[in-house]
């Protein structure tokens, strides 16, 4: 069975990510959402929380599962017998970076290809970074994130108050 992987930090997972996951789940029989530890990015949510939020956000998709990983994506690709790496692209600004990653991952994973899926217009401007910025400045992010993330952000805001 063909299994693809959609990696990211997902800090937090957004409706843009969810759109890519839902569209990928229609195209492939098995999708793994791989949440990267990314300790150098100083995430808002720890890895365990990001995995849980991703799981809750994709619970309606029976052919999607979520894993957390640290280290190289190529190692997760080998471990899970991945057919292709899915990458979402919002704008041409993403292209150069994603192309470099695709070449690097092809070398490190012995030939596994990266497939680029363009964002829909509705979500082309949404990123986790923008969501965090809006949240940290007490803005409203409910139109940009799935309900589990919104609930977690609201709980976090109340705890910080």
UniProtKB/Swiss-Prot annotation:
Residues annotated as binding substrate: 9, 41, 73, 87
One term of GO molecular function: pantetheine-phosphate adenylyltransferase activity
Lineage: Bacteria, Pseudomonadati, Pseudomonadota, Gammaproteobacteria, Pasteurellales
InterPro entries: Cyt_trans-like, PPAT, Rossmann-like_a/b/a_fold
Organism: Actinobacillus succinogenes (strain ATCC 55618 / DSM 22257 / CCUG 43843 / 130Z)
Protein name in UniProt: Phosphopantetheine adenylyltransferase
Top EC group: transferase
Coiled-coil region(s): none
Annotated Gene Ontology cellular component terms: cytoplasm
């Amino acid at each position: 069975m063909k299994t693809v992987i959609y990696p990211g930090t997902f800090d937090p997972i957004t409706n843009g990510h969810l759109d890519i996951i839902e569209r990928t789940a229609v195209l492939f029989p098995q999708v793994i959402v791989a949440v990267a530890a990314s300790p150098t990015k100083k995430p808002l949510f720890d890895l365990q929380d990001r995995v849980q939020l991703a799981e809750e956000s994709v619970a309606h998709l029976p052919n999607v599962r979520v894993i957390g990983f640290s280290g190289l994506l190529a190692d997760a690709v080998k471990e899970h017998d991945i057919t292709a790496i899915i990458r979402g692209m919002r704008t041409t600004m993403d292209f150069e970076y994603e192309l470099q990653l695709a070449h690097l991952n092809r070398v490190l994973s012995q030939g596994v290809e990266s497939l680029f899926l363009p964002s829909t217009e509705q979500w082309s401007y949404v990123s986790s970074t923008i969501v965090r910025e809006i949240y940290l400045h007490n803005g409203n992010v409910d139109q940009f994130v799935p309900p589990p993330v919104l609930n977690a952000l609201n709980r976090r805001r109340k705890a910080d108050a």
